[in-house]
Amino acid sequence: MIWHVQNENFILDSTRIFMKAFHLLLFHGSFIFPECILIFGLILLLMIDSTSDQKDRPWFYFISSTSLVMSITALFFRWREEPIISFSGNFQTNNFNEIFQFLILLCSTLCIPLSVEYIECTEMAITEFLLFVLTATLGGMFLCGANDLITIFVAPECFSLCSYLLSGYTKRDVRSNEATTKYLLMGGASSSILVHGLSWLYGLSGGEIELQEIVNGLINTQMYNSPGISIALISITVGIGFKLSPAPFHQWTPDVYEGSPTPVVAFLSVTSKVAASASATRIFDIPFYFSSTEWHLLLEILAILSMILGNLIALTQTSMKRMLAYSSIGQIGYVIIGIIVGDSNDGYASMITYMLFYISMNLGTFACIVSFGLRTGTDNIRDYAGLYTKDPFLALSSALCLLSLGGLPPLAGFFGKLYLFWCGWQAGLYFLVSIGLLTSVVSIYYYLKIIKLLMTGRNQEITPHVRNYRRSPLRSNNSIELSMTVCVIASTIPGISMNPILAIAQDTLF
């Protein structure tokens, strides 16, 4: 009898939960339609995996890529619609959030073809890899639109858990296991600090969790200038700092970049920064509206440390992946300038524009590393010497992406940095911009050093890795070259094409 009553209660509770979920999807599903497409793609992947054999592997890539492209299409159709807050205040849809969601989807779309040959050569489990990539993308998209403290905490955890699993995907690799352990421990610690800061905001605002309501709550409780706000600001900065990986929160970055599978590093190097930048912009600009001087100072310190340490330490690296890890630390310093400037002087527009170019430059470089690594088994910088004599296309692609990362004209990276630094200069950030210009010159040096090695033709400098290098016989069928070509073209577009990009980026007020 007791069992019968408990069973009935369980069925009733399950029915209520299902009906509530159905009600939310029915009345709010249109507001998260791009995310719903990814969810259906995930379900379809699981269904096909449970009923198929190895012959259906190409379908997994097709379903994943199609889901991402359809999500991008859904975002385009929703562009310029009125801002909407849905799911009882948990999620906000506006142009600002959508452009960051587009950047995340673009990263994932380019990373999947970049991973195909790597997965086949290393015999990694394809379904789990694609599931983790799509789920991480989903977490990043929800983080971009997060409008309350709970979603701001849960969404990055969804992304982080998939990131930990992806970084440790090659279980037999000792370096991968070590990198995953460091990543997991530091990620857990940073999440604890982040939720500590969020709890301070919750308490000081009188129990509010929505971002705009927190501002109203702080005004009502008169706590917007209290010491507790400073504690919340520092804690949240540390928590978000781990995701952005500026100095001094960068300790995990070089080890994870070096130890993780290269396609995973390519994915994490851009998506985590895009999602964290969107979240940081909203958190600092809305709940900490009354503490703008304090968070500006904090971010200025992080930007200076990142630009100096990232570029100086990159000079001494012998591994391509570690060099790009420290380079990314310097790059995030430039992005922080846009966050500090804010919307008054097109700071957000310059940040979005530079981030779009950074995606193409960075993924293009990683595509070259994946291609070279699969054919030689190394990512040591010295082993790239003389690559131009064996594979001119790969060498030129690497050179163009590296030059664009360095900011040499007339490549896209130059115009991105020029616009970013110009906005910073107009906002009065003279010292920050000066540091940015000097460190950009330093970065050009170590990028040119690699390019010199790529183009050398002296036999005594060419290593056995390049001497025994074999080009892909069917380049048109190689998916890595597809991603590489797209990224190289996007990294080298002339300045005349900047106007439409800037026009879209400037229309991102939230």
Swiss-Prot record:
GO MF entry, a single one: NADH dehydrogenase (ubiquinone) activity
Entry's localization field: Plastid, Chloroplast thylakoid membrane
BP term (GO), one: photosynthesis, light reaction
Residue spans crossing the bilayer: 24-44, 59-79, 99-119, 124-144, 149-169, 184-204, 229-249, 295-315, 323-343, 354-374, 395-415, 418-438
UniProtKB keywords: Chloroplast, Membrane, NAD, NADP, Plastid, Plastoquinone, Quinone, Thylakoid, Translocase, Transmembrane, Transmembrane helix, Transport
InterPro entries assigned: NADH-Q_OxRdtase_suN/2, ND/Mrp_TM, Ndh2_N
EC number of this enzyme: 7.1.1.-
Gene Ontology cellular-component terms listed: chloroplast thylakoid membrane
HAMAP family given in the database record: NDH1_NuoN_1
Name recorded for this polypeptide: NAD(P)H-quinone oxidoreductase subunit 2, chloroplastic
